[in-house]
Amino acid sequence: MINIEDISKSSNQSEEKQLKSTSSKPKYSFAAKSLFKGSNNITPYYLSTSNTFQCVASESIQTWLLSDDGHIFTSSGNFVLDVSSGGYFVELVQLNSNSKTQIWTIDTTNNKIQNQGNGNYLDIDCFNICVAPLNGNATQQWTTFRRAPIPTGNWGYFQSEQLGSNNYWGLSVLNNSTSYNTSVVMNKVQAKSKGQIWQMTSDGHILSRLDGNLVLDIGPSINGSTTNYYLNTNVYKANDLMQQWGINENNQIFNQYYPNLCIGFVGQLGVDSTVNCVLAQPSSACDTCFQWIANPTYSLNQIVSEVPEPFPAYTSGDLLASYQYLSNDATSNFTDDIRSLYTGINVSLQSFLSIVTNATCPSSIHSTEDFSNVQNQIKTELIYAIDVRLVFENYSGFYSKLFSQGSSNLTNLANLINVDMSSNQMVNANYTDAITSIFYSLISEIPVGGSIIANIGQSAVEFGELMSQSNYQGASTYQVELSQLYTHLNTNYENEMANAQSMKDTILQDWGMMSKTYALCFLPTNDPSSLNMNGLDFEKISDVASVAYEIAMIQMLLPTTYQIYFTSAGYWVPYSDGDFAYSDNSGTYIMATIKYSNSYPPKELTDKLWNNGVSKQEFFLSAYGWNLATSLTYYNTTNQYSNIFKLAFPTIKNFTGVPMQFVMTNDGDNLGNFTVKTHFAKFFSTYYSVGDLGHHYFDIAVTDINKNKVANFTVDIKLKALEGSYVSIKTGSLVVQPGYAVGNPICNQGSYSLMFSASILIPIYKSE
């Protein structure tokens, strides 16, 4: 290959049952607590890790992932527990499916964790985790319990638990700068401030919403100290423990390289002040300068993940008689088990409460004390159930209103974008991404109030994923025919409504879950864990959500009609800015129809974008939810690029939270290597020459930042005389690694008459 040149210029389950997985992938998250209490016989210790990959007994709870084949993964899924080569200590290593010492059996009946390679049991030796023959000591006894996983892949705030005048204070990038090595500080949380919005990735990085590869990192030492550091932003680095973080049971954000150091701040949170954040050792476990709340908290996700706590049992005597009498009295003899109706749709719990409250002890029940105890308990349960149901009814009302105009909205947008909705053309339609973008808009524009809706909605999504795979009906489709798009959206809407209903029923059937949920209903609205909807501006919330959903539908439909035309800096373009153009240091991007590079979108369409806060940079670079293919274009043809119409330039879209890289080769010749930022697309911007008419094949290999394979495929460029090139993925060439999914490739023909290249966009998602 010749002429290579860079042209870009620059449920009520038992604990044991919960610890079982139905998948070969890491699925269920848990923590392990030792019955060993230390020298003071008080301090609890948990199975944890150190920065040397040695496993230790620590006061900090660590979340692990259990697979059905017995592997115990770190929460990031990158490493597994194994016995060291000496056969004694336990350490973290990469997965080796052929190693039996990486297989463990958790016995929740006898509180033992046994290694299948040597038959020994998990033990503690001077706070180091080891394996040893069964000895009956407390150091070999472990209680395991479900842990709701730290939500990854969702955007939100990290707010300080210190509140001043009811103002939120959050982790912030100074001045919303996208430059690396920018200080991370404390500021009051403000609407539409991307520098305050973060995402915890699956490998423990904390990603900023400001830019794709911008992450939280350790900054310079404070006065030369080895235990006190400033925080700043940096480029995402592979396997760098200084950029990887965890959250412990004290709501402290600790660093994986310095596990004893946590994020905090020093000073007073004054009005409109900026305070430097630091990495240091907290003065105590309850030092609020080092305690954080992830907002949304997804508190419901935590609640439904806990060990079930049944209602007080009434099995005999006057207790049972009282319960059955009150049940029959309240339900007009419909049932003697009133608790079975807490989830009933067509029953009035308010009516039941009134009857139970006014009931008197019948002569057939001898113990008025037992009757009174049961009566008070059922009254409390009904009060709790009424408020819990009201929370979900309000959410369902919001959600139903959001999608009530779905069919007409989709039709109107299709007409505006000039899309044939009866077509069998495939589009990328990931419903989960659409819902996530709605929740992001709510928390971004309405930090107080919007997070409550996001809390319920995202918890419902997480709850659906925690259900058994045979029952879960989530949004698993990444591509769908246009003619089936509305059906697809409606089906997934109904599934998510069902998930919320199922989560509500699970809560109403468990005394512990119902009590905890009820308590959240009376927290102040500005508390990140609150479910208190009193006083919320639902009109504003609905308006923001409706706009976000409309934008999500535009993201699905737009690539069927439009693409981006890129011209390198220094070459003539008809427009460099305006409603359908954007320029940066590399060149100019223009939106036009796929067939005609001089046919631009109507103002009504562009107004829906720019008037609703869509970032031009994100749009034209196909970042976040946008996925438009990009064609290389020269409006004034030069001899140097006169064969541009013969070429095809691929774009890789990374919908995941981990950076990727891709390389395109032809017959062994490397045509270019490119990094794809998280949630961004990367356009292959290296000019190359191509041969005669017919098929020409180019191989593309995609890896993540750690050099792990993601996908491989072959691009087929077909040349015909006096026509622009045709581009596609060669049949049978696509190989996708487990854990990833490739959406519908967007393939657009080049043009001989208008002198632009073919384009192909390949979207890559993280699959469950």
Swiss-Prot record:
- GO terms, biological process: response to cation stress
Q: What are the UniProt keywords, alphabetically?
A: Cytoplasm, Lectin, Membrane, Repeat
- Fetch the InterPro entries from UniProt: Ca_Up-reg_Membrane_Reg (IPR051780), Ricin_B-like_lectins (IPR035992), Ricin_B_lectin (IPR000772)
GO cellular component terms attached to this protein's record: cytoplasm; membrane; nucleus
Which residues are in the Ricin B-type lectin domain? 25-145, 116-248
Q: Which PROSITE patterns does this one have?
A: RICIN_B_LECTIN
Q: Where in the cell is it found?
A: Cytoplasm; Membrane
How does the entry describe its membrane topology?
Answer: Peripheral membrane protein
- In the UniProt record, the signal sequence range is none
Q: Where is this region: Disordered?
A: 1-22
Q: Name one GO molecular function term.
A: carbohydrate binding
Q: Which family does it belong to?
A: Belongs to the cup family.
Write out the function statement from the record.
Answer: May play an important role in stabilizing and/or regulating the cell membrane during Ca(2+) stress or certain stages of development.
Q: What is the protein name stated in its UniProt record? A: Putative calcium up-regulated protein H
Gene source species = Dictyostelium discoideum
The organism that produces this protein has a lineage beginning with:
Eukaryota, Amoebozoa, Evosea, Eumycetozoa, Dictyostelia
